[in-house]
């Protein structure tokens, strides 16, 4: 399973790259707004650091505007993937962009039928938001499982990016289910590497070493 980093913070991305954990990056307008600098510069800087897909989201809600923005974004770097919202206008934009060879990531997916429609429109990636479903007392990972089943039924090659990840369990479940990608906030990524028994083991080794050197 590929690890994408869900952030626009260049320092977090660089740390993830050093760990070998940044197969790609996903951004959105909210993440971009947290950083200093203009949108295009931030995206270019991310592309310079990461050797993998970088999702940049359009702001327009109408098909023509989405396509216009997407074409401009696609000129910034060859690794750019255009994030398109899961709407009727978004599906039209995805179809048009796919015909022009521009990769897309359909975002804000909350049902398996939305994911199927995105794939049929020609999406390169689809992003089910598991954490937001969990917030509504639903099980977001059930959605991922359903999408995987549907895609497997029809040999659909659209990749599934498990998004809105809130904790390590989401990542574990995504891996066990066979999702293509988990896009992970940097704070959650660090938690994946941690375990109390690892810390206790290190402390024990160091204490034993100190005793042996006396």
Swiss-Prot record:
Listed name of the protein: Probable transaldolase
GO cellular component: cytoplasm
Location(s) in or outside the cell: Cytoplasm
Domain of life: Bacteria
GO molecular function, one term: aldehyde-lyase activity
Keyword set includes Cytoplasm: yes
Primary localisation category: cytoplasm
Pathway(s) this gene product operates in, as recorded in its UniProt entry: Carbohydrate degradation; pentose phosphate pathway; D-glyceraldehyde 3-phosphate and beta-D-fructose 6-phosphate from D-ribose 5-phosphate and D-xylulose 5-phosphate (non-oxidative stage): step 2/3
Catalytically driven reaction(s): D-sedoheptulose 7-phosphate + D-glyceraldehyde 3-phosphate = D-erythrose 4-phosphate + beta-D-fructose 6-phosphate
């Amino acid at each position: 399973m590929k690890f994408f980093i869900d952030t626009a913070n260049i320092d977090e991305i660089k740390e993830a790259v050093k760990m070998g954990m940044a197969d790609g990056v996903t951004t959105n307008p909210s993440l971009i707004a947290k950083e200093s600098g203009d949108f295009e510069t931030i995206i270019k800087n991310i592309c310079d650091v990461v050797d993998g897909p970088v999702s940049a989201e359009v702001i327009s809600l109408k098909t023509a505007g989405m396509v216009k923005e997407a074409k401009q974004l696609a000129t910034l770097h060859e690794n750019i993937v255009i994030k398109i919202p899961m709407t009727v206008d978004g599906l039209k934009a995805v179809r048009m962009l796919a015909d022009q060879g521009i990769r897309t990531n359909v975002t804000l997916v909350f049902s398996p039928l939305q994911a199927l429609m995105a794939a049929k429109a020609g999406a390169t990636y689809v992003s089910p938001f598991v954490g937001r479903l969990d917030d509504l007392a639903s099980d977001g990972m059930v959605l991922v499982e359903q999408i995987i089943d549907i895609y497997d039924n029809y040999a659909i090659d659209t990749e599934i990016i498990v998004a809105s990840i809130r904790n390590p369990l989401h990542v574990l479940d995504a891996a066990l289910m066979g999702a293509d990608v988990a896009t992970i906030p940097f704070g959650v990524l660090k938690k994946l590497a941690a375990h109390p028994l690892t810390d206790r083991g290190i402390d024990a080794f160091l204490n034993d070493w100190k005793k042996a050197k006396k």
